[in-house]
From Swiss-Prot:
Zn(2+) binds at residues 70, 101, 106. One of its GO terms (molecular function) is cytidine deaminase activity. It is one of seven related genes or pseudogenes found in a cluster, thought to result from gene duplication, on chromosome 22. This is DNA dC->dU-editing enzyme APOBEC-3A. Its cofactor is Zn(2+). Changing residue 136 to A: Altered deaminase activity and restriction activity towards genetic invaders. Its EC number is 3.5.4.38. Changing residue 72 to Q: Altered deaminase activity and restriction activity towards genetic invaders.
Amino acid sequence: MEASPASGPRHLMDPHIFTSNFNNGIGRHKTYLCYEVERLDNGTSVKMDQHRGFLHNQAKNLLCGFYGRHAELRFLDLVPSLQLDPAQIYRVTWFISWSPCFSWGCAGEVRAFLQENTHVRLRIFAARIYDYDPLYKEALQMLRDAGAQVSIMTYDEFKHCWDTFVDHQGCPFQPWDGLDEHSQALSGRLRAILQNQGN
């Protein structure tokens, strides 16, 4: 079940769904996006717990004429309901199972959102780089150029997600085999992509 932007009880993710979608495995076809919003005030941040939750992409159903909706765009769809005051500065943090794509418009839509909403700062922590998209480097560079801070999730971010967004029933986060090595390798790849201005 997904979190609602409205006030009320917050839904939590099933532990198996979290682990299977955020771990190092390949062949995952869904993108999960956990989000939280903070108001920045004189160098301090104020967490806005009512603006915290998770969502995932909607699969296409061509029989109904529905072409699907990526998780990043679904988040942008709910932003108006968050009623973020343009006179305040906000930091939105995404913990996302795949980095945003280029070919299906996600990076471009996020860039447009950031350009139109200069009171919002975006941090993206991705579990994996979406290199199935041939233009994935362009997507990451576009996000960087739009002012988004893009990083790879490490143990700390996975644990934070587990503690914050998962119905863990009191069980502590158990890192999977290769988590640190995988995060370090992806961080190196991402650093190289973001440092390359031309490609």
